[in-house]
Amino acid sequence: MRSILQLRVPQIAGDEDQLRGLKIETTAASSPSVVRFRDPQIEMAHGAGGKASRRLVEGLFAPLLYPASREPLSDAAHLEVGGARIAFTTDSFVVKPLHFPGGSIGELAVNGTMNDLAVSGAKGIAMTVTFVLEEGLPTADLEAEVRAMSGALKRAGVVMAGGDTKVVERGKADGMYITTAGIGTPLPGVKVDARSVRPGDKILLSGPIGDHGITILLARGELDFEADLYSDTRSVLPLVEALAAECGPGIHWMRDPTRGGVATALNELARDSGLGIELLEEEIPMHDAVRGACELLGLDPLHIANEGQFLAVVSPEYAAIALNSLQQTAGGEEARIVGQVRVEPANAVLVITRYGGSRIVDMLVGDPLPRIC
């Protein structure tokens, strides 16, 4: 891969002294070199972002690739090299179909990568892309995705720094897969860490849940159900920047609830913080079409993927300010305070239903909606 962008980060490549001083602040938690993953083979659920994914990462990848780290899992790594700070992330996109109401794989690849940086407390500045293309893919389809990606880059103010292309035999890639990497610069005054979360903190959600996952399901024609529904794929950076400007020191944690949905993201927070999460079901914004589809299929909307929303945990004194900043920013009009952090139930998420009851909601188990991003 050839890079066409020179970054103003001192001597990251080629300087052994600087590389020895590389500090990775956010990677995966593990016990050094102890491989605990015992599943006999890889299943679709291992890529769904839920329990099986976490078991794979913590049991196999983390012990061998990050043996010295004790940091919680995060959407991006924040690196310090010679006094300069950058954020770094990587992602892959295998969504099926390639085009869907409200977006496509190319636009999703840019937005998803930049959103991982945004919720880590950074503004994306550059990315790279690798296309894995299937032999026989119509050139018009590829051009459409590159154009979609170009548009998303311009809207985000991000430079494409380089890329690579591979072609595999017919029938081996379902059209195309896209892998990205992104770098960004930290937002001033924002430091998110699950270990900073405290009992009494408030949980905010930027908008309606489930649009993306249900849109993809409908686009596949697998459900005899019609709805005027669109993927929510978009950049969340404007909302994150608005939140940071008003209450940066009060932001303790952020996450975009993609694979595995809101339930999985908040279960990860509960386990990484050792605290409990209380969600108010009646406060969670959701379109009627999403609710109806989930009821028809027996799915929990809290497990459905989103691609243009994010969760934020803020200290209670900033809650009203944070909510107002989101609701006054384009795309955040339906933001809500949806819950709070509690001491109990430790390491778990408790949903208070609209009827006054309660239930524990766990991480996603299995993969009810595969390849949604």
Question: Can you describe what each PLM-predicted range is?
Answer:
Residues 2-373:
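Helix-biased detector of long, well-ordered alpha-helical tracts
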